[in-house]
A protein has these predicted regions:
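Beta-propeller-forming repeat regions
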Residues: 1-176
Length: 176
């Protein structure tokens, strides 16, 4: 992902690999570890965007990548909101959120009331085998005033049986 992480008006690079999430500071590309080893299994995705208007991006992360386990949320999938410290070059505090198995992709979505929701897309529906079974539960997470408190979710869709990616787009002119 590309975003300004420190309000210096320069685009920084944010990367997620199996064990680490880090940002690389423009223009020296100095690496700053945000979090390490959120779960037993690999990190799989990040959503990066300035959602509070302070010029510095916020981050959510998906982890516990285990696409073969489609039922047990303790063995497959994890969603985290990462709370930044005052000094963003230091480690961030992960807040684990409720989730569906096979967490796969996520994006920040600007709602019509100009607030941001985190939309999370699993790879498979619960108990799904060979693209048969329950549909993928795409959820929108609503940020509470204190992100350490429980996040409410809204079901966006549950009709697909396997999904690999998504993006946010404005398809019409209604601004919503």
């Amino acid at each position: 992902a590309i975003a300004d992480m420190n309000a210096d008006m320069k685009p920084d690079i944010i990367l997620c690999d199996a064990r680490n999430i880090a940002w690389y500071q423009n223009p020296t590309w100095k690496k700053h570890i945000i979090v390490e080893n959120l779960t037993e299994r690999d990190h799989v995705c990040i959503a990066v965007r300035d959602i509070d208007g302070d010029g510095r991006a916020e981050i959510a992360a998906g982890a516990q990548w285990n696409p073969g386990e489609t039922s047990d949320t303790s063995k497959s999938g994890a969603v985290f909101y990462l709370i930044p410290p005052d000094d963003r070059t230091e480690k961030w505090t992960p807040v684990q959120l409720q989730h569906e198995p096979t967490t796969h992709r996520m994006r920040w979505f600007n709602t019509p009331n100009n607030e941001f929701d985190l939309v999370v897309l699993p790879l498979h529906g619960r108990g799904n085998r060979a693209n048969k079974g329950e549909g993928v539960r795409t959820l929108a997470y609503h940020i509470p005033k204190d992100p350490k408190h429980a996040w409410k979710t809204t079901l966006v869709d549950d009709n697909m049986h396997a999904s690999h990616n998504f993006d946010v787009a404005q398809w019409d002119s209604d601004k919503a």
